[in-house]
Amino acid sequence: MKPARIVFPGFWFGKSSIKKAEELARLGVGGFCLYGATAKKAQDFVKRMQDVSPYGQLLFCADITDTLQEVITDAPALPANGKIGQHDFPQDVAYRKGYLTARMALAVGINWVLAPVVDLGYNTPAFGDVPLQVTQLAGDFIAGLSNGGALNCVKYFPGVSGVLKTLAQMEDAEFVPYKHMFRRADAIMPSDMIFPNIDNDNQAMLSDKVIKGLLKKRLNYKGCVVSFPLFKGHLKYEAASAVKMLHCNVENILAPRDAEGVIDAVEREVDKGFLVDEIIHAVSNHEMFLSKVAAGPEPLPVKEAFALAEKDFKKK
């Protein structure tokens, strides 16, 4: 068993050390979250990491809220989520956005798109403020991602717009998209915010009440939960927080500031006899995700994928 496999370090192009990334790949991390790459640099990085990894195949994540341009700087622009509802056929546009996002992502080596955001609101990256509209558009986006060959991640649970609401109020609003999409979600990502009416002491991503009590038990979600990217999470003690998340049934730790420190902390916990079953389960899901990607469509050449996206939305 390799606890490192549940950790996905961040790699910031132009800032992060490629040698350090290679060391982490050799340690057996499950993949990487990419930030600020061009298509060519992303392709080169993906190949280099898979060449040195003991597993050969890794999961590479696009940590986005709206469009692939957030992490692949030369990717074509696609319609913002908040404007999709203005189109004549919004569900078709949402599907095409998901499909083209996946085709472009796979072309550069990214196989896990950490989207969509299903928070309710008026501004991007929200699809809208009406629960059923968000459910429909996000569901079509996910269908497009899946048919395009990429994994998805629905976020940010339990819904940022419900931060001051009661559970009863959230039941008919923020929870609606989640309940409709659980079967299609490859993963759920909890928020980094505190929801005082659920757990006044912990951020959602660190909350046993939010993840185990609400998501897993009350809403009966059976799938994978991934962490909010740790470097964004305002965590005082990152490694200890990562261990706490794993005890809350989070399976994968994304983009820590100190990946080696997190891996060491998890390994110490395993040496004490804790988290063994949880990590075995997480690694099993990881293998399932790799198989799902392998069974999907072959990646297009980058130029072809980008041209497809540019052509598709010129008239939309």
Task: Name what the model sees in each region.
Residues M1-G10, K155, G159, K212-H234:
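Mobile, glycine- and charge-enriched loop segments
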Residues V46-P54, L106, A138-N147, S207-N220:
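Surface-exposed amphipathic alpha-helices with a cationic face
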Residues H180-I198, G223:
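Oxyanion-binding "anion nests"
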Residues L137-Y156, L164, A168-A187:
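Phosphate/pyrophosphate-binding betaalpha-module
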Residues E22-L137, Y156, S161-Q169, S191-A204, ...:
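Enzymes and membrane/adaptor proteins characterized by extended Gly/Ser/Thr/Asp/Glu-rich
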Residues M1-G28, K217, K236-K316:
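Preference for extracellular/luminal or secreted protein segments
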Residues K19-L24, T101, V108-I110, I142-L145, ...:
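Structured alpha-helical segments in the cores of large, soluble enzyme domains
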Residues P3-R5, V29-G30, P54-L59, G109-N111, ...:
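Short, well-ordered coil/turn segments that N-cap beta-strands
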